[in-house]
Design a protein with these regions (language model features):
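ATP-binding N-lobe of GHMP and related small-molecule kinases
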Residues: 1-83, 283
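Active-site catalytic microenvironments for nucleophilic, acid-base chemistry
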Residues: 56, 60, 98-105, 118
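Long, contiguous secondary-structure blocks with strong helical propensity
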Residues: 74-76, 92-104, 187, 226-231
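DPxDG-like acidic metal-binding loop motif
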Residues: 83-109, 125
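ATP-dependent small-molecule kinase catalytic core of the GHMP/sugar-kinase superfamily
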Residues: 108-234, 250-264, 268-288
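Short beta-strand
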Residues: 235-239
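Short beta-strand->loop micro-motif that forms the acidic, two-metal-ion catalytic signature
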Residues: 244-249
Length: 288
């Protein structure tokens, strides 16, 4: 038996046209998918992409395909689905590492990323470091040295959008329009990591969130920006292919109850009725 876990993401710190194609930097948070791989017959309610990952690994290490029928995958996750929280990446990445360990192998981050994108567009939560990642083909993987400490008040909406559906939206002109802002945002992410400055990271995320309004607009976005300003928060980040929003803050410095009260006053809770206070964590899949 082997158990692994991978964090969710609160949308992306940045996503857009950077270095010649659409890329992203995920925002890993302390909400995990935990996957147990053991010997046994498959569960009836298993997640199809997790099974696809097991089959992909058997193929990768040249095991007979029928071995899959003796491998049980048990995914335990409460990460919201189809809202931009990287629930699917967490499931398949944790499945990959648990399966590899179960079969007596190891997977490095680069191989893991390659296997994940072979199944679907992938979040950079699969890397320990904050990483600029080409989520479609894994061709770019630029890691930042370290990351500032911060918390996120994650605003959850009832709205859902499958990543695959987002990728069908014509968005080339919107991506090009935001390219200059995203270049600045990527520079700020790197500066924030070097200087350990959460405000700089917030500036990067806010730039990217604003550019994303051309592609997948969030409701009452100006009210969100005003709240960030009024409460002196670090910034706001969004799911660029989902509905979730993150208010970037420090729970020891900022009054979270007051921020929640302000959300209600500005009627923002109409769009985001659920809130979760979470730490930003290091990414990567951990064996348990």
């Amino acid at each position: 038996m082997a158990v692994a876990q991978c964090p969710a993401s609160c949308g992306e710190l940045i996503q857009g046209w950077i270095l010649g194609s659409e890329k992203l930097v995920s925002c890993p948070v302390e909400w995990y998918s935990t996957v147990e791989v053991s010997s046994g017959s498959p569960l009836t309610d298993e997640r199809p992409l997790s099974r696809a990952m097991v089959d992909r690994l058997l193929q990768y290490w040249q095991y007979p395909a029928h071995m899959s029928q003796d491998i049980r995958i048990d995914v335990q996750s409460t990460i919201p689905v189809a809202k931009g929280m990287a629930s699917s990446t967490a499931d398949i990445a944790a499945t990959a590492i648990a399966t590899a360990h179960y079969l007596g192998h190891q997977l490095d981050e680069q191989t893991l990323a390659q296997l994940c994108v072979s199944l679907e567009p992938t979040d950079s939560t699969v890397f320990r470091k904050l990483t600029l990642f080409d989520h479609n083909d894994a061709s770019t993987q630029i890691g930042c040295e370290s990351q500032p400490q911060l918390d996120l008040l994650v605003l959850e909406s009832p709205e859902t959008l499958r990543t695959a559906d987002y990728h069908r939206i014509p968005r080339h002109s919107g991506l090009q329009a935001g390219a200059a802002a995203l270049r600045r945002a990527w520079d700020k992410v790197q500066e924030a990591c070097v200087s350990q400055n959460p405000y700089r990271l917030g500036e990067a995320a806010t730039l990217s969130a604003t550019a994303s309004q051309l592609l997948l607009p969030k409701p009452d976005f100006d009210s969100l920006l005003a709240l960030v300003e009024e409460c002196d928060l670090y910034g706001v980040n969004v799911a660029h292919s989902g509905s979730v929003v993150g208010l970037m803050l420090d729970r020891t410095r900022h009054d979270v109850d007051y921020i929640k009260w302000m959300l209600a006053q500005k009627k923002l809770t109409v769009h985001w009725p659920q809130q979760h206070l979470l730490r930003m964590v290091t990414g990567g899949v951990e064996l348990q």
